[in-house]
Design a protein with these regions (language model features):
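Conserved catalytic or regulatory cores that recognize and/or transform ribose-phosphate-containing ligands
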Residues: 1-106
Length: 106
């Protein structure tokens, strides 16, 4: 079964984001889940590449890609603080509406 991680990122350092993600990934893999990466760091998502493509709502672009990846998943794992992050709340609504298993960080 495939799972993605939804986590708040605003106001966090890259290191904090990766640390939280790696911890969650290890827990999920221990439970037998296959991890689908939703941390988009390749060149396609650089500020310059998005500007070239005409992206004006960068957070919405990331959310759209996350929702696309959600379509490949059976479950979504929500990290602490998700209720305070607009994108996480939208991902949660989509996961519930489409019947994915919803998991929460303790």
């Amino acid at each position: 079964m495939k799972v993605m991680i939804s986590q708040p990122m605003a106001g966090k350092t890259d290191e904090e984001i990766v640390e939280t993600r790696e911890k969650a990934k290890a827990e999920l893999e221990e439970l037998g889940y296959e991890f689908i990466n939703t941390l988009f760091t390749d060149e396609w998502y650089s500020k310059e590449a998005m500007a070239e493509r005409g992206v004006v709502q960068v957070p919405l672009c990331y959310l759209a890609k996350s929702l696309e990846n959600m379509s490949k998943c059976h479950a979504v794992y929500f990290c602490k603080g998700w209720k305070s992050a607009r994108g996480c709340r939208i991902e949660h609504d989509a996961a519930v509406a489409y019947g994915l298993a919803v998991l929460y960080e303790d």
